[in-house]
Design a protein with these regions (language model features):
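Non-catalytic structural scaffold of enzyme domains
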Residues: 1-218
Length: 218
């Protein structure tokens, strides 16, 4: 069973490969394409134009032609999926999978976000997928971690993410969610007996549920 990915951060390839192994999936069945230029074009323009959405969807459909499922890992490009008509294989937004997983848990949801421009879209997304048991959605901008990540200060970056997760749990969060896939390695660094949710595992589990569960590893 083949899964294709459209990334805008090169480091996400390894993050998804590592997570796939923990879920019993075969890494040699994963195909990664990185298009950082699409995210950068949206950021430079300040809007997700119809032309950029069209280019994003062309990439997704090309990946879908050679896969049993496609995962879009960049939240910035996520709205393009809504304009796709029915496709032959599932196209899963990692951010939507995360929001849905958090919504099922319920209670007080705290989302850690590294990009200020993504705070409001993230809040709206999580509120849209909140179940009746969700009491609140709080999106916290942890500004310094994106700069640390881009400068390759990875250990300090993940330590800062975990510290923010610990603070959120201490403040009463029922569930803490990491908004960006590249944050996933910091999941196991959190304390307080709770494990934050990440979009990497959430997206892969969503594909497994839609396509065929553990048989994906065959």
């Amino acid at each position: 069973m083949r899964i294709s990915f459209l990334h805008t951060v090169d480091g996400n390839k390894r993050v998804f490969d590592d997570a796939a192994k923990t879920l019993g999936l075969r890494v040699d069945n994963l195909l990664h394409e990185v298009r950082s230029d699409l995210r950068e074009a949206v950021q430079d323009a300040g809007t997700f134009s119809a032309a950029l959405k069209g280019e994003t969807n062309r990439c997704l459909l090309a990946l879908a032609a050679h896969a049993d499922a496609v995962i879009l890992t960049c939240a910035t490009l996520g709205p393009a999926v809504e304009e796709l008509e029915s496709t032959q294989v599932p196209i899963v937004r990692a951010d939507v999978a995360l929001a849905a997983a958090a919504g099922k848990v319920g209670g007080k949801i705290t989302v850690l976000c590294a990009v200020e421009a993504a705070v409001e879209p993230t809040r709206k997304l999580f509120e849209r997928h909140a179940s009746d048991t969700v009491t609140s959605v709080d999106v916290i901008h942890i500004a310094r971690v994106w700069a640390l990540f881009k400068s390759d200060n990875i250990d300090e970056c993940f330590a800062a993410i975990a510290a923010s997760a610990n603070e959120a749990y201490e403040a009463g969060a029922t569930v803490v969610a990491y908004a960006h896939p590249w944050m996933a390695p910091a999941v196991n660094l959190a304390r307080n007996g709770s494990q934050p949710l990440d979009s990497v595992h959430a997206a892969l589990r969503t594909v497994m549920q839609r396509i065929g569960g553990p048989s994906l590893g065959i």
